[in-house]
Amino acid sequence: MEVTQRGCDELLIAAEWEQKLARSAATGVPLRIKLGLDPTAPDIHIGHTVVLNKMRQLQDLGHQVIFLIGDFTSTIGDPSGRNATRPPLTREQIEANAQTYYRQASMVLDPSKTEIRYNSEWCDPLGARGIIQLAAKYTVARMMERDDFTKRYKAGVPISVHEFLYPLMQGYDSVALKSDLELGGTDQKFNLLVGRELQKEYGQEPQCILTMPLLVGLDGVEKMSKSKGNYVGISEAPNEMFGKLMSISDDLMWTYYTLLSFRPLAEIDLMKQEVTLGRNPRDCKVLLAQEIIARFHSQADAERALEDFNHRARGGVPDDIPQIELSGAPIGIAQLLKQAGLCPSTSEANRNIEQGGVKIDGTVISDKGLKVEAGTFVMQVGKRRFARVVLS
């Protein structure tokens, strides 16, 4: 139970889970633990690994973990936490994204002990008749208990009928897999409960539910999301990961320790006490960044990332910056930053100039109207973006 509950938001129903654990221990039959992810983006970020870490902990206890790729449900679009209809993905987008999902998840899970499934296996054969029969097992009133549906209904925001199907299809996954426990973020609680109810309808023992907190992004405000730009991708370069993790606030660091670190809780509590007594929290942040980077890359990469970070902090330039060859001199500074790939747009370039975040050969550029002449120089935007530009 201690492993199950570490860092979790809610365990339903705790007494039932204890009974399942006891039965598994007595019979030697591992419990079936399910986690489903819709491949809505091509990469996994560390926010996704909060539930993956929990899966790995339960996997290490000998239970059977099932990594479910929602290739069917992705064509519907999950309405969880949405204030408008989520556009469904095409089959081509789903297939392209799914290719990287399991490979990246295997950085956390033990692939030799992981059952990988696609929910199109049982959802596609249902057909219209099967889906209608499934829909008959749940009422509109129950569906409207969802907080996001209720808010949209009261606000007069349209709710499409197909959005009601999403939690039903996700719940049917639990029936097909005969899961004993389903994991998900706190925003998935309703969907997980639907699975529990549908299992009862199909005469199965209902699954227990374990919800994990949604990881707050680097900004410390909103949940981690690629669309919000406040994320750390698990496939990012070690130096980039290190810089991003060192940018989080000292308070947020402890949340990251609880949800992302494999260190014993007693050790984390001791570090908190040491910081209270005067230890520099930066030291603890370095340890966290190195642990996460070593998990997805290597310990050697983590050490090199620390060296690079310290080098930059002293005003140094990284050794491995890209070299960009451009023509058109003289050229406006904002346009040059865009062409060099250091800023996504000229407006973003101008914002960085206004904030004093642009340097050429170590000199801060404050003139947005600057015309840059031909030459070779190092350009820097913020603390982590560098390029050696050869302009002709």
Swiss-Prot record:
A motif ('HIGH' region) lies at residues 39-48. Keywords: Aminoacyl-tRNA synthetase, ATP-binding, Cytoplasm, Ligase, Nucleotide-binding, Protein biosynthesis, RNA-binding. Its main location: cytoplasm. GO terms for biological process: tyrosyl-tRNA aminoacylation. Gene3D superfamilies: HUPs (3.40.50.620), RNA-binding S4 domain (3.10.290.10), Tyrosyl-Transfer RNA Synthetase (1.10.240.10). It is found in: Cytoplasm. ATP binds at residue 226. One of its GO terms (cellular component) is cytosol. It comes from the Bacteria. A motif ('KMSKS' region) lies at residues 223-227. Its EC number is 6.1.1.1. It catalyses: tRNA(Tyr) + L-tyrosine + ATP = L-tyrosyl-tRNA(Tyr) + AMP + diphosphate + H(+). Residues 331-391 form the S4 RNA-binding domain. GO terms for molecular function: ATP binding; RNA binding; tyrosine-tRNA ligase activity. Belongs to the class-I aminoacyl-tRNA synthetase family. TyrS type 2 subfamily. NCBIfam families: tyrS. Homodimer. Catalyzes the attachment of tyrosine to tRNA(Tyr) in a two-step reaction: tyrosine is first activated by ATP to form Tyr-AMP and then transferred to the acceptor end of tRNA(Tyr). This is Tyrosine--tRNA ligase. It comes from Ralstonia nicotianae (strain ATCC BAA-1114 / GMI1000).
